[in-house]
Amino acid sequence: MKMTEDVRKLIEAKHAFEKRGHKATLIQNSDRYTIIDWRRSDGSGDYYVNYIVDRKRGSLIISGDLGDCIATWYNPNSVHDIAQYCISVYYFISKFQCASDKYDYDDIETIADIREELEEHGVNFSDMDFQEDWEYFQDELPNYVNAHGFSPNGSVSDFLEKYLGDDWWDGSDTWGRSVSPRVYLWIAGLSMAVDQLTEAGLLSEED
């Protein structure tokens, strides 16, 4: 059975923590709140994450070296439930109220996604006029991709309208987009920390 991209990236995130020897410390575990400190066993802040779970509200607050995030389910949930829900990456992202950049954008991947759109629109890549336009477009496109996405104008948007139509922008927000490694690290860290604390008898299956 082929491993999905999300599973592969979660395994990589887990290995990143294992390599650094991360250890979970239970800071608080009251009727409502569970606070977990997840950091290297030597106490350094490299890849440090702090997790706060509000079980009554069903919210997860993440802070630390890997960025910040607030995710909310709006109904009571245990720590184990939330850790399990987060394994579904896009479901977890859908619960974000705010977060450090959750997506990365890459100009090479953006070009690949646009090429796929052009092929679906039946564009003839052998046409000499198109080839000239396409070469110029690929040279210019990296100027319009940054940490926040793909924001074309000028000749780049003119190219897209010419070959994809005036509704080319529909769905363009996903071009070149991938989930940031920090999201996989947040998920893997919470799962590993909860497992460690449960195995140590510091969290029960009901927590």
What spans do the regions from the language model cover?
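Short N-terminal edge-element motif at the start of the domain
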Residues: 2-63, 68
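Extended hydrophobic/Leu-rich segments
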Residues: 3, 10-13, 17, 24, ...
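Intrinsic disorder/low-complexity signal
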Residues: 4-5, 11, 36, 53, ...
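Exposed alpha-helical structural elements
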Residues: 6-12, 76, 91, 113, ...
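Alpha-helical interaction segments
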Residues: 28, 66-68, 124, 158-159, ...
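Aromatic- and glycine-enriched beta-alpha-beta binding-site module
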Residues: 49-97
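An exposed acidic His-Trp-rich patch
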Residues: 82-139
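A eukaryote-biased signal for long
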Residues: 127-207
